[in-house]
Amino acid sequence: MRWLFWSSGSQQAPNNNKDNNNNNNNNNDDDDDNNNIIIINNNINRRPPLTLECPSPSHPPCASCSTKATTFPSNPKRGWNTSLTARDWAGEFKDPRNLIPTLLLTGGILFCVRIHRQYLRRIPLATNISPTYFHKRSLFGRVTSVGDGDNFRMYHTPGGRLAGWEWLPFRRVPRVKKELKDRTIHIRLAGIDAPELPHFGRPAQPYSHAAHTWLTNYLLNKRVRAFPYRQDQYGRVVATVYVRRFPWIFLRRDVGLQMLRAGMATVYEAKSGVEFGGEGKESKYRRAEEMAKRRGRGLWKGWKGAGWESPREYKNRMAGVEGERAAAAAAAAGVGGMGELGVNGGKN
């Protein structure tokens, strides 16, 4: 039995040796295939490939590994000081990583410039207002002084608090009169006419001081919004003005309409050049004036009595008086000239 086991084992040994020889042959064939190096020329860079003794780019090389992998050189990185050709410049500019940020930055700058010119540019004087503002745009600012019962001066603050006015250090409204010179817009309330204060040698009209005091208390140091219509012959801007007052800060009030209701002004009467901001506003103004008349408010107290005159009648009367004075002065100058001429003629 021992001989049979040995003999059977001796018979299987040649087969095992044959299998081992086959396996060794296969391994040798694999090694020969792996040792073959494939060289591919780069058509763009015209550089030969580099070979690394590494089985895979994802695995580090080892001492027992003799497999060679083929890699290809990449384009060298350019520095900031590297000179570029025209072709390189075109390629760099068309790169989306450069083109898209450039377009976004340029568009953003142009948009900011347009917004600043249209909405955030401060207007110092009434004469600097573009005609495109009339009947289309508005002016926002703080009232710095009240000159009469129907006009005041405003410091333009475009954008208001959202643009930094009143809380940023470099966006403060000046308080000193000297600093406000040639930096405020002279506004005349549209559609109303208040009693005249004494000026240009004319006496004060009744209720002129009351109207001036009322408007000063109502507007001075307040933020207002004016809708300009045109410029008058005195360089002022004729505009409808709105203001928000505590506690009704969410409701804006028409300043001219409030003066008519208080009896501190009349509806503006003139043959031409009257601005109301629309027919609907004119009818509203006339209804407010009629209500103040019936209730006898302000300058309408005793208006049916003798000697009462409206601001328009006062202006017409003073214009007539000044015309008579001018005619008398011209006549006196003419008589004096004739007398001197006669004296000189007698001497000759």
Swiss-Prot record:
Alphabetized InterPro entries for the sequence: SNase_OB-fold_sf, Staphylococal_nuclease_OB-fold
GO terms under cellular component: membrane; mitochondrion
Keyword Mitochondrion: yes
Cysteine-cysteine disulfides: none
Family annotation (SMART domains): SNc
Lineage top rank: taxon: Eukaryota
Keywords tagged on the record: Calcium, Endonuclease, Hydrolase, Membrane, Metal-binding, Mitochondrion, Nuclease, Transmembrane, Transmembrane helix
UniProt key word Phosphoprotein: no
Primary localization: mitochondrion
GO molecular function, one term: metal ion binding
Biased amino acid composition, Low complexity: 15-27
Active site as annotated: 188, 196, 236
Binding site residues for Ca(2+): 193
Residue ranges of the TM segments: 99-115
Protein family membership: Belongs to the LCL3 family.
Protein name (record): Probable endonuclease LCL3
